[in-house]
Every structure is written in C-alpha cells, then in structure tokens.
UniProtKB/Swiss-Prot annotation:
Name the record gives this protein: Small core protein
One matching Pfam family: Microvir_J
Residues of the signal peptide: none
Source species of the chain: Enterobacteria phage S13 (Bacteriophage S13)
Job of this protein: The J protein is associated with the DNA and is situated in an interior cleft of the F protein.
Location within or outside the cell: Virion
A GO CC term attached to the entry: viral capsid
Location of region: Disordered: 1-37
Residues in coiled coil: none
Broad class of the protein's primary localization: virion
Protein encoded by which gene: J
Length: 37
C-alpha cells in the first residue's frame, strides 16, 4: 500500500490510480451490499 501510494504520487499516475481505487472500492461496496441484501 505504501509503495503503491508512492508510485501514485507521480503526476501521470495519481488520476488513473485514484479512479481505479475509488471505482474498485465502490464496486466492492455495491457487490457486498447487493449480495448481502
């Protein structure tokens, strides 16, 4: 996690990494909520 964050601190990597992380987190929450619900 620390190494990934350091690499993501670059100028051309923070946007894609951030979008992927946010999308993955949202998808996981949706998946868990949909499956549990």
């Amino acid at each position: 996690s620390k190494g990934k964050k350091r690499s993501g601190a670059r100028p051309g990597r923070p946007q894609p990494l951030r979008g992927t992380k946010g999308k993955r987190k949202g998808a996981r929450l949706w998946y868990v909520g949909g499956q549990q619900f």
